[in-house]
């Protein structure tokens, strides 16, 4: 399924998600335009991961409104799952397969070609040596790049990344920032979670803060304006 035309990738209006009777999101409202790079900041337990899972169509909306890439989540969560890519802490890789085999497996599922796999690896700066290395033997940064290459071959329009900088050294974190900016220049929208104040403010044009399941601030570091 293709997405409906429009400039807004994510629109939440007083969105409530209840997990086990507990309001993991308690009336969150925000919007993300297509092509934006946005950091979602907050302490553990504030609803960051739940918001990503909501936008990925993995958890139901209890109340409020939520539209992702032109699709109303109340109507068709399955359609949304075909349009977005959610990357969690474990990267979703098979440790016994090589880097390239992991990406090729995703390509096979979505009907992408071997050339698409090669192009994705090249975009992520994955060289021939890394490509034939088992995922279990890769560094944290290399595993993250492999997982992101899978999002590219899926042609995911919206990248939802849960703590993508976690476990990376400074050099790998800075390289990841460049990759995410390049992804938006290529047409993707990127929303990632972090609990690091400095990383959100310095590396990303816009930072949305969650507390208690609600959006408490929305700041553009590029223009220095709080919304």
Label every model-predicted segment:
Residues 56:
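Helix-to-loop junction immediately C-terminal to a conserved catalytic motif
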Residues 64-75, 80:
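Conserved ABC transporter NBD signature motif
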Residues 104, 114-130:
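Conserved ABC ATPase "signature" region
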Residues 159-163:
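Catalytic Walker B motif of ABC-type/P-loop ATPase nucleotide-binding domains
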Residues 151-152:
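ABC ATPase C-loop
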């Amino acid at each position: 399924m293709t997405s409906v035309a429009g400039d807004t990738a994510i629109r939440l209006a007083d969105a409530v998600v209840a997990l086990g009777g507990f309001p993991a999101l308690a009336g969150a409202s925000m919007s993300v335009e297509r092509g934006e790079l946005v950091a979602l900041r907050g302490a553990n337990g504030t609803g960051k991961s739940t918001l990503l899972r909501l936008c990925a169509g993995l958890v139901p909306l209890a109340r409020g409104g939520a539209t992702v890439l032109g699709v109303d989540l109340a109507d068709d969560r399955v359609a949304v799952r075909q349009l977005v890519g959610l990357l969690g802490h474990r990267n979703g890789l098979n440790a016994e397969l090589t880097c390239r085999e992991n990406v090729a497996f995703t390509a096979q599922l979505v009907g992408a070609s071997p050339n698409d796999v090669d192009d994705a690896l090249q975009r992520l700066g994955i060289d021939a040596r890394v490509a034939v290395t088992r995922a279990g033997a890769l560094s944290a940064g290399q595993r993250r790049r492999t997982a992101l290459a899978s999002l590219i071959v899926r042609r995911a329009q919206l990248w939802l990344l849960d703590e993508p900088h976690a476990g990376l050294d400074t050099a790998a974190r800075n390289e990841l920032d460049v990759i995410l900016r390049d992804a938006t220049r290529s047409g993707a929208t990127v929303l990632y979670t972090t609990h690091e104040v400095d990383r959100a403010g310095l590396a990303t044009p816009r930072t949305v803060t969650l507390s208690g399941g609600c959006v408490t601030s929305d700041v553009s570091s590029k223009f220095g304006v709080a919304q």
